[in-house]
Regions:
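Short, Lys/Arg-enriched N-terminal segments with co-localized hydrophobic residues
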Residues: 13-27
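Long, contiguous binding/interaction regions
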Residues: 28-72, 76-188
């Protein structure tokens, strides 16, 4: 079964779609959390497994956990659920992989960080500051013709924030990609 994230009537052309009963279904967005031993080559093997099966990794985030010698890898991608389930089973068999989770829907809480350098002069600073306040962004550097702003949130919040700042001129941008944890008392 293919889950839809967007439906479009037949007659419109879209890339990477699956046709089913006169509608196009976009592949579902997946957030995969992988707990691993922090060893040489683990990340390369995991990324290779995804790319070898035709998945394009949209975001990739790696960092140590609170346990010594362990790291969490968070991967976001779009893809067919059946093919991804097979890939996850193969991931789970890799030697240094401790556990793999595919967060579907509201099972996980995800956030990303963005640093954005925006063109700002004396006439636009107040408006940019108001946008920052609405999105709970933080101005972390002020220069004569620019501001560097930090913001965190889910992917949709970050997109909306960047859309508003785009009219001022974004000169540089760095995003972390999603990091995610499972909701509730169960841990990965």
């Amino acid at each position: 079964m293919v889950r839809a994230t967007g439906l479009h009537p037949v007659g419109h052309r879209f890339e990477s779609c699956v046709v089913h009963h006169s509608f196009y279904f976009y592949p579902m967005r997946h957030v995969i959390s992988v707990l691993v031993e922090n060893k040489f080559g683990v990340l390369a093997r995991i990324a290779g497994l995804f790319s070898g099966r035709g998945f394009n990794i949209d975001t990739l985030n790696v960092g140590p956990t609170h346990e010594d010698g362990r790291s969490r890898i968070t991967v976001t991608l779009n893809g067919d659920e059946k093919a991804l389930d097979q890939c996850i089973k193969q991931l789970d068999k890799l030697i240094d992989v401790i556990r793999v989770e595919n967060f579907v829907g509201e099972e996980g809480v995800g956030r990303e960080l963005v640093l954005v350098k925006v063109n700002a002069d004396s006439q636009t600073r107040a408006e940019i500051t108001q946008i920052c306040d609405v999105f709970r962004g933080k101005i972390i550097d002020v220069a004569p013709n620019s501001l560097i702003i930090e913001a965190t949130g889910n992917e949709n919040k970050i997109k909306a924030f960047l859309n508003l700042l785009d009219s001022f001129g974004i000169s540089e941008l760095a995003r972390t990609g999603t990091v995610s944890l499972r909701r509730g008392s169960q841990n990965i």
